[in-house]
């Protein structure tokens, strides 16, 4: 039984490419590298991992080099160093360190959910290797972080203590809970297959060191980080920016994206029949949108 748990925690869809590892100042980061061409680095949010992009990468890998890291946000397999900075500033630094370590240039940084919040910090403070920025159904200056819709603020509250954090996550052992609005039900419009969900929830349920990383990360988030980043971006970010937004998003309202796109001078495209995880709900539309935008 335990070996099966390990398999579920470490399983990544083979369409992402072979898993690789890179040593960064914060610790070892596992990532996948698939395709060739202009580089897209995909940044996921809390309690998911590279599997979020499993449907999208094979639709892009014929024309783009797709880098999909597992960030230390609770669904990863390699624990960070105990003293690693996993505040929003620290996660942004980790992403920047990843781009440096892989010597990636003119990167399109694609952030979804709280990955979009971290991507804004990267663009504000570490833009040297960026060529373009895609923000997809994520925090804006009007959002709280964690977002209030869906009750995700409870994640930060319970992160204050290891036992409260452990107790909160126990409900994820029940498959029916995965469709609740305060777990994944308002993030993916349709159910996610159990193997993928196992890779999302098993690490934080079974491994205290992974739960420790997740607690550090979610316990440190605050809207003050995204608002400061937004101020810097609206004041002068000279790369193309796209907001790719789920038209029916329950967590990050499309109206927020409309106002943020105007402030950034960015293009906004709405994706129908999708919640926050557009790469999960609408991979074909998302791939077509990216291809078209890159050609414009």
What feature does the model see in each segment?
Residues 23-25, 33-35, 40, 235-236:
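Short, flexible hinge/linker loops that cap or flank conserved catalytic cores
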Residues 25, 34, 69, 271-273:
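Conserved beta-strand termini and adjacent loop/short-helix elements that scaffold enzyme active sites
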Residues 51, 55, 146, 255, ...:
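Generic recognition of short, well-ordered alpha-helical segments
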């Amino acid at each position: 039984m335990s070996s099966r748990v390990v398999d579920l925690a470490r399983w990544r869809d083979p369409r992402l490419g072979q898993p690789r590892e890179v040593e960064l100042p914060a610790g070892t980061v596992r990532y996948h590298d698939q395709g060739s061409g202009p580089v897209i680095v995909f940044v996921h949010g809390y309690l998911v991992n590279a599997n979020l992009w499993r449907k999208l990468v094979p639709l892009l890998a014929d024309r783009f080099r797709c880098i999909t890291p597992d960030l230390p946000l609770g669904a990863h397999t390699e624990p960070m160093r105990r003293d690693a900075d996993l505040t929003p500033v620290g996660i942004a630094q980790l992403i920047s360190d990843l781009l440096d370590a892989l010597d990636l240039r003119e990167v399109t940084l694609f952030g979804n959910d709280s990955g979009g919040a971290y991507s804004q910090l990267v663009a504000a403070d570490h833009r040297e290797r960026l060529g373009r920025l895609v923000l997809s159904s994520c925090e804006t200056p009007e959002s709280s972080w964690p977002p209030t819709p869906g009750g995700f603020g409870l994640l930060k509250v319970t992160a204050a203590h290891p036992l409260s954090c452990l107790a909160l996550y126990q409900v994820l052992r029940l498959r029916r809970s995965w469709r609740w609005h305060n777990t994944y039900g308002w993030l993916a419009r349709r159910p996610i297959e159990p193997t993928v969900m196992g890779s999302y929830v098993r690490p934080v349920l079974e491994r205290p060191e992974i739960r420790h990383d997740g607690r550090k990360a979610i316990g440190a988030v605050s809207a003050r980080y995204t608002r400061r980043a937004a101020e810097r971006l609206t004041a002068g970010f000279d790369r193309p920016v796209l907001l790719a937004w789920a038209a029916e998003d329950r967590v990050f309202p499309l109206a927020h994206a409309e106002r943020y796109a105007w402030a950034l001078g960015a293009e906004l495209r709405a994706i129908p029949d999708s919640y926050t995880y557009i790469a999960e709900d609408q991979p074909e539309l998302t791939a077509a949108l990216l291809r078209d935008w890159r050609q414009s």
